[in-house]
Design a protein with these regions (language model features):
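Conserved active-site "lid/cap" helical segment
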Residues: 39-91, 101-111, 135, 139, ...
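Conserved hydrophobic/aromatic beta-strand scaffold that supports enzyme active sites
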Residues: 9, 21, 33, 164-166
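Claisen-condensing/thiolase-fold acyl-transfer catalytic domains that form or cleave C-C bonds
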Residues: 69, 73, 91-169
Length: 169
């Protein structure tokens, strides 16, 4: 099985003119679906009763997708309820590149134009937390995203955690 590993970050200077909205939530629902069971004193790596798989990331993708899709939909709805913007104002959506199915959900369920949702997963795979900044930089470098564009970032993480930001680039 191919594995990907990467790291990336984007640095933004806080300016009231450009950061329009930011939100992060964590829910315990589904926490057992994305976790590393080992570590600490409970399943210490050197404990003879600890198995190798206890110290590896474990995920039930289909189950966590169902929960994350519903939570993401609510986060999208709340973003536009809590701001003066609407979906049509968004130039580009830069989502976590979890899977093609997850990316397409921003069009199907989030009701964003499919052409406005940045998709690099077919070239990079799921690079976990690095996928959002990687997708952003890719779209800037290839000329899709330009200064003045309204960008909606949204990402998920184990736990289940989710964050979004609405910025003018």
């Amino acid at each position: 099985t191919p594995r990907t590993s990467s790291a990336a970050s984007d640095v933004y200077k806080r300016q009231t003119k450009t950061l329009h909205y930011w939100k992060m939530n964590t829910w315990s629902q589904g926490a057992n679906l994305t976790e590393v069971r080992g570590g600490g004193t409970h399943l210490h790596p050197q404990n003879p009763n600890t198995k190798l798989k206890d110290n590896l990331f474990s995920m039930d993708g289909p189950s966590i997708y169902k929960i994350a899709r519903k939570k993401a939909y609510k986060m999208v709805i709340n973003t536009f309820k809590e701001t003066s913007f609407n979906r049509e104002d968004v130039s580009w959506v830069v989502p976590h590149q979890a899977s093609l199915k997850a990316i397409n959900a921003y069009h199907e369920y989030g009701r964003f134009d499919k052409e406005k949702v940045i998709n690099i997963v077919e070239n990079t795979g799921n690079c976990v937390a690095a996928s959002v900044p990687m997708a952003f930089v890719t779209a800037v470098k290839d000329g899709r995203i330009n200064r003045g564009d309204l960008i909606y970032f949204i990402g998920t993480g184990a736990g289940l955690s989710m964050a979004c930001a609405l910025i003018t680039y």
